[in-house]
Regions:
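N-terminal acidic leader/helix
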Residues: 1-29, 35, 64, 68-69
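Short, charge-rich amphipathic interface segments used for partner binding and complex assembly
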Residues: 29-68
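Short acidic DE-rich linear segments
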Residues: 70-74
C-alpha cells in the first residue's frame, strides 16, 4: 500500500470516527485528524484544489451531521 493510499484510508477512518462519535469532543478530535490527512495529501501528493476542497467540505458535513445527531439525542 502506498503512502497516498494509507493517508486516504486514514482519512476515511476519521470520517467514520466523526460519524460514530458519542460526544462533541471526540467528533472534533476526529475532524482535526481528518483535516491533517487532507493537508498531507495536498502538500505531499499534489492533490488538486477541487479534490482538496471537496474533502474539506465532506469533513465539515460529517461534523455538522454528528453535532446535529448528538444535539437531538439520536
Amino acid at each position: 500500500m502506498t503512502e497516498k493510499e494509507e493517508l486516504l484510508e486514514a482519512y476515511r477512518k476519521e470520517l467514520h470516527n466523526i460519524a460514530t462519535a458519542r460526544d462533541p469532543l471526540a467528533a472534533e478530535k476526529a475532524m482535526c485528524k481528518a483535516r491533517v490527512y487532507v493537508g498531507e495529501l495536498k502538500h505531499n501528493h499534489k492533490l488538486g484544489e477541487k479534490d482538496v476542497s471537496d474533502m474539506y467540505e465532506t469533513v465539515d458535513v460529517f461534523l455538522w451531521r454528528a453535532n446535529r445527531r448528538m444535539s437531538e439525542g439520536i
